[in-house]
Regions:
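Non-ligating segments of multi-cofactor redox enzymes
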Residues: 1-208
């Protein structure tokens, strides 16, 4: 592998408009039920009564997530059809013609990135808009974000520019697959580690 492309996401800038999600769906003509990029609406805190007053400790932030093109992609390891490959540029590619639709990759991926297309009978996933990259263009989701909360590039360059945070709630431990994802956390993300927090749109993003 000569490089590792990665996504960058700035949770502190994201408004939750889901333009990235819509742009991805439009570019790849995804059917109903498939979302290669999903925006998780995280909420937490509570209202507590203090005497005659009610005090709010409520917080909320968004996490936009697609395939993280992990450095240790578990989908590549578990696929019995060898339909997945890790390209020299770090992109985890899926050969849909080889895929037998067993869904092992979907069950194994801690991010739920591979998604089953009921009509086609095989798995599908984000390819980092490889055709756009070949044409010198950014991924559709990155180009669509009105607040520039998304970026992409080589992982080392993104880390040098934005820092080395790779996980916030509700994402799993980065050590599992070493995701090629760099993040700027929302100011309230640290609270989700020690206060009650939940995904507010769990059904929409198909979160387990």
């Amino acid at each position: 592998m000569t490089r590792q492309y990665a996504f960058y996401f700035d949770s502190s800038a994201c408004s939750g408009c889901k333009a990235c999600q819509a742009a991805c769906k439009d570019k790849h003509s995804l059917p109903v039920g498939l979302l290669w990029r999903r925006v998780y609406e995280v909420a937490g805190g509570a209202w507590t009564r203090r005497g005659a007053a009610w005090v709010s400790t409520v917080f909320a932030y968004n996490v936009s997530l697609a395939c993280n093109h992990c450095e240790r992609p578990i989908c590549v390891e578990v696929c019995p059809a060898r339909a997945y490959t890790k390209r020299a540029d770090g992109i985890v590619a899926l050969d849909e013609e080889k895929c037998i639709g067993c869904r092992y990759c979907s069950w194994a991926c801690p991010y739920g990135a591979p998604q089953y297309d009921e009509q086609a009978g095989h798995m599908t996933k984000c390819d980092l808009c490889a055709d756009n990259l070949d044409a010198g263009l950014p991924p559709a989701c990155v180009a669509a974000c009105p607040l520039r909360a998304l970026d992409f590039g080589e992982r080392a360059e993104l880390e040098a520019r934005y820092g080395t945070v790779h996980v916030v709630y509700p994402l799993p431990d980065a050590e599992l697959t070493q995701p090629a994802l760099v993040m700027t956390p929302h100011q309230d993300a640290a609270r989700a580690a020690h206060e009650p927090a939940w995904i507010g749109n769990r059904e929409e993003v198909n979160a387990e």
